[in-house]
């Protein structure tokens, strides 16, 4: 080998110039201080431009303006529940939803504007997309509307919303009661706590469903419970358990709450509840009977018992 750079089909003087350039010449240029300074300047300029561009670009969410997001993917995770992936305007966008808050979803159905609230289950750093896990109910206007969407159809969204915003060290022991898709705000909080080493909050989650196949995000929940067994206690309750089931059976009871969740007299603790309305009503009654404070009609961050 001669060490000459092979050049084909380059016209005129440029070709003649490059024919006399060796690979060694190129290496010398690439290692020269001037070249390194120029390359560094280009990298810095690109980073600066990217930062300025991203900071001036509108955020995906606005609490006062409805925005449309196209459906990118649908993944059926149980007979009546699916994970819907929606596309953000730019590939580098993150949704920017504070931990514990939710979005509003709106649709015009039968001449009426219907609004419901959902907490995305996508991770905080997910770029270019967000995910909603939604159970379709026979009489659920919004859930049936979302289920009817085809890839490319848009969903009208506004946010963030909500009175709960998790910050590290909010409380020492967090007790959670979730039913079905009510897991959504809980999994966001669980992830935020366990994946932040300085946050030493202990968590107990009672998660209720009808059938075993209805347990959502089970692989992730089980992995977190195994990986953080000293800080994350996970207890499943099933209404229709399979043979050999070792978890709770039936509904979440006062006994489950007394045995697993923080004591009502434990000062540095909170109880969070999210699930279908009948379940929430039953849990409020159970908590009241074992001397937890009665939840407010509209929960606030400093409440002992917070209902999403």
Swiss-Prot record:
It holds the Pfam family FAD_binding_6. Its cofactor is FAD. This is NADH-cytochrome b5 reductase 1. Belongs to the flavoprotein pyridine nucleotide cytochrome reductase family. Its main location: mitochondrion. Disulfide bonds: none annotated. Its EC number is 1.6.2.2. It is found in: Mitochondrion outer membrane. It is a single-pass membrane protein. Keywords: FAD, Flavoprotein, Membrane, Mitochondrion, Mitochondrion outer membrane, NAD, Oxidoreductase, Transferase, Transmembrane, Transmembrane helix. NADH-dependent reductase for DPH3 and cytochrome b5. Required for the first step of diphthamide biosynthesis, a post-translational modification of histidine which occurs in elongation factor 2. DPH1 and DPH2 transfer a 3-amino-3-carboxypropyl (ACP) group from S-adenosyl-L-methionine (SAM) to a histidine residue, the reaction is assisted by a reduction system comprising DPH3 and a NADH-dependent reductase, predominantly MCR1.1. It catalyses: 2 Fe(III)-[cytochrome b5] + NADH = 2 Fe(II)-[cytochrome b5] + NAD(+) + H(+); 2 Fe(3+)-[Dph3] + NADH = 2 Fe(2+)-[Dph3] + NAD(+) + H(+). It comes from Laccaria bicolor (strain S238N-H82 / ATCC MYA-4686). InterPro entries: CBR-like, Cbr1-like_FAD-bd_dom, FAD-bd_FR_type, Flavoprot_Pyr_Nucl_cyt_Rdtase, FNR_nucleotide-bd, OxRdtase_FAD/NAD-bd, Riboflavin_synthase-like_b-brl. GO terms for molecular function: cytochrome-b5 reductase activity, acting on NAD(P)H; NADH dehydrogenase activity; transferase activity. GO terms for cellular component: endoplasmic reticulum; mitochondrial outer membrane. Gene3D superfamilies: Nucleotide-binding domain of ferredoxin-NADP reductase (FNR) module, Translation factors. Residues 64-167 form the FAD-binding FR-type domain. Pathway: Protein modification; peptidyl-diphthamide biosynthesis. FAD binds at residues 147-162, 173-205. GO terms for biological process: protein histidyl modification to diphthamide; tRNA wobble base 5-methoxycarbonylmethyl-2-thiouridinylation. The chain crosses the membrane at residues 29-49. Monomer. Component of the 2-(3-amino-3-carboxypropyl)histidine synthase complex composed of DPH1, DPH2, DPH3 and a NADH-dependent reductase, predominantly MCR1.1.
